[in-house]
A protein has these predicted regions:
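Hydrophobic alpha-helical segments and their helix-loop junctions in multi-pass secondary transporters
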Residues: 24, 97, 134, 138, ...
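Small-residue-rich segments of transmembrane alpha-helices in multi-pass membrane proteins
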Residues: 16, 43-47, 79-92, 152-168, ...
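Transmembrane-helix boundary/entry motifs in multi-pass membrane transporters
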Residues: 2-9, 38-44, 67-99, 117-123
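Hydrophobic, membrane-embedded alpha-helices of multi-pass small-molecule transporters
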Residues: 7-27, 46, 96-100, 167-171, ...
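Extracellular/periplasmic helix-exit of transmembrane alpha-helices
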Residues: 58-63, 170-176, 195-198, 230-253
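Structural signature of hydrophobic alpha-helical transmembrane segments
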Residues: 117-130, 192-202
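Juxtamembrane transmembrane-helix boundary signature
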Residues: 17, 48-74
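Membrane-interface loop-to-helix entry segments
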Residues: 111-113, 122-130, 137-168
């Protein structure tokens, strides 16, 4: 039972990463196209590079947080930066405030618009419902966040696979055509890597909401296992979305 609980925590934190990373721009393909597909056939490998970059960073941060028992981002930054903390901890505060203004706004707007489309209720009412749901989940702490993240992740993954996989199988010829066109256009690898780097770096700000989950790990090395699983999940789902976009990328309509 203890071993089962340990691995459920490891998987739960991995799902927290996925649900934090996942959003309207991810599901619709807007972000994937902007940062990956538009740079040619390299889009088949650059999502993996970005996620490995994130996984290494997050694994170290969670390992550090668990080892030094610093579970809020201010304490974590103070321990990490040492004598430079007065500068970099305060800079991170500014960054975190900016991210927290933008990211929830996107979540509320996307969730509210989707719920409004599905239910026919006014957009503002749906946005309020999304906000109340997020608030309730947040106030009950990290255990509930992990449970909700696990349930949402499974629903999201199943939903994406149901939508994308049949389309990918049915349009395999279009994917081959798109890949051939991309290959012949000879998009530079450097630009593709730089775009993946930008995407991955933007995601690093999420560490502020991750370090609190390090408290649940039995030992620091569990962070490496958790982020390894999260990396695989994110790579698979990003690749699925990339292939889904490639089915229509060569069709101007």
């Amino acid at each position: 039972t203890q071993s089962k609980s340990k691995y459920s925590i490891i998987l739960g934190v991995a799902f927290v990463w996925f649900t934090t990373h996942f959003g309207g721009g991810f599901a619709s393909g807007a972000q994937i196209y902007s940062y990956y597909v538009r740079y040619g056939v390299w889009c088949l490998i650059t999502p993996a590079i970005a996620m490995i970059y994130n996984a290494v960073f997050f694994a170290y941060c969670l390992y550090f947080a668990r080892k030094h028992e610093v579970y809020d981002y201010r304490s974590y930054n103070n321990a990490l930066y040492g004598r430079f903390a007065p500068v970099f901890s305060n800079l991170f505060e500014v960054l975190y405030i900016c991210v927290m203004c933008v990211a929830p706004a996107v979540a509320f707007a996307t969730g509210g618009a989707t719920l409004s489309t599905l239910t026919g209720l006014p957009y503002l009412v749906c946005t309020l419902v999304i906000g109340v749901f997020i608030f309730i989940v947040a106030i009950f702490g990290t255990d509930l966040v992990r449970r909700v993240a696990s349930v949402l992740s499974i629903c999201i993954i199943v939903g994406l696979l149901i939508v994308y996989i049949p389309n990918i199988i049915a349009s395999s010829h279009e994917i081959s055509q798109t890949a051939s066109t991309m290959n012949s256009d000879a998009f530079p690898l450097g630009k593709a890597l730089y775009s993946a780097f930008l995407y991955g770096t933007f995601q690093l700000a999420n560490v502020a909401v991750f370090v609190q989950h390090a408290r649940s790990f039995d030992k620091p090395k569990d962070a490496v296992k958790s982020m390894g699983i999260g990396c695989v999940i994110n790579i698979i789902m990003m690749t699925v979305v990339v292939l889904g976009i490639m089915t229509v990328a060569s069709n101007p309509d």
